Design a protein with these regions (language model features):
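Short alpha-helical segments that sit at the start of domains
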Residues: 1-34
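Domain-edge interaction signal
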Residues: 115-121
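Clustered cysteine/histidine zinc-coordinating segments, centered on FYVE zinc fingers that bind PI3P
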Residues: 2-6, 31-32, 55, 109-115
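Minor-groove-contacting beta-hairpin "wing" of winged helix-turn-helix DNA-binding domains
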Residues: 75-80
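Short amphipathic alpha-helical interaction segments
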Residues: 48-65
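A short, conserved structural fragment
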Residues: 64-74
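Short, amphipathic alpha-helical interaction segments positioned at domain boundaries
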Residues: 83-113
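Short helix-coil junctions and helix-kink-helix linkers
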Residues: 29-53
Length: 121
């Protein structure tokens, strides 16, 4: 199945959330898991998406049906296929994130002294 942009976004959000949430537990034999409802709640509260909770739930169901995520014992997680797709998405967007960070951190005008300016009307 080809992933739609919405499915890619949800898969990336879930994968990145797990990656960041579990960083604090690297030295311990523990792992954080969340339910579908909690994931939807986190995504909505953080303002990551504008979709209705029902639409997010349906997208998670589609990802589960196509074996990108699994839901066992109220724990939502990426499958091997989902992990592989997440890593590919991350690899594809990393250059854009790096450029955005570089431009945001340092004044873009400081990279060159030969810039041109024109009056805009």
């Amino acid at each position: 199945m080809l992933l739609t942009p919405t499915h890619k976004f949800i898969l990336f959000t879930l994968g990145f959330w797990y990656k960041e949430a579990n960083k604090k537990l690297v030295s311990k034999p523990l792992q954080i898991f969340i339910s579908k409802a909690l994931f939807i709640d986190i995504v909505k509260k953080a303002g990551m998406v504008e979709k209705q909770p029902r639409a997010l739930y349906k997208n998670l169901e589609t990802l589960e049906k196509n074996r990108f995520v699994e839901y066992n014992n109220k724990c939502l997680s990426l499958t091997k296929k989902g992990e592989k797709a997440f890593l590919k998405i991350q690899k594809d967007i990393t250059p854009y994130i790096i450029v955005a960070r570089l431009v945001a951190e340092k004044d873009p005008l400081s990279y060159s002294k030969k810039l041109q300016t024109k009056f805009s009307l």
